[in-house]
Amino acid sequence: MSDVEIKVENIVASATLGKSLELPKIAPALENVEYNLEQFPGLVFKLKDPKTAALIFGSGKLVCTGAKCIEDSIKAIHMTVDKIRELDTEIPEEFEIKIQNIVASANLGKVLNLEAVALDLENTEYEPEQFPGLVYRLSDPKVVLLLFGSGKVVCTGAKTADQALLGVQKTKERLIELYLIEE
């Protein structure tokens, strides 16, 4: 595989507590929380360490965003649930945490002619009047890459950092195969 490094920019993880939550009671008891039902149907609970935001919904679902590694994402969800459990002792000890999306960035180190890439590379969308990047969809791993003329890449849709890395590596190799960039 080609040598390219990725940087994880954001991880989105979710958890289902299996119990509905009384947000009007929880909101005033938490620090660093935003709760405005007219603007958003849940609480936004911000943690400083790890620096994340947890979206807490009345259905008992949580979404954590902002972590840079899976461990921090899991830690943030557990910290959030522990805070909620202080207010509601019926919150189950066991719950499933699912990684929903990993966003990573990379730099191919080469300028890309996106017009040529759009013509030669399969499964792409490129409309420069609407968005400056080219959208490239891979099926294995199932990720979407945004390619920019500068050679910078954003990979989204991965469930693991390895999937994001593999997506970027496969993309670079395909661009080399098609003579769209040099090795």
Curated annotation (Swiss-Prot):
SUPFAM superfamilies, per database record: TATA-box binding protein-like
Keyword Transcription regulation: yes
Sequence repeats: from-to residues: 8-84, 99-175
GO function terms (MF aspect): DNA binding; DNA-binding transcription factor activity
Organism: Methanosphaera stadtmanae (strain ATCC 43021 / DSM 3091 / JCM 11832 / MCB-3)
UniProt keyword Repeat present: yes
Gene3D superfamilies in UniProt: TATA-Binding Protein
Protein's name according to its UniProt entry: TATA-box-binding protein
Family matches, as CDD domains: TBP_archaea (cd04518)
InterPro entries noted in UniProt: TBP (IPR000814), TBP_archaea (IPR033711), TBP_CS (IPR030491), TBP_dom_sf (IPR012295)
Top-rank taxon: Archaea
UniProt-listed GO biological process terms: DNA-templated transcription initiation
Keywords associated with the record: DNA-binding, Repeat, Transcription, Transcription regulation
Similarity comment: Belongs to the TBP family.
Function, as annotated: General factor that plays a role in the activation of archaeal genes transcribed by RNA polymerase. Binds specifically to the TATA box promoter element which lies close to the position of transcription initiation.
NCBIfam families, per database record: PRK00394.1-2, PRK00394.2-6
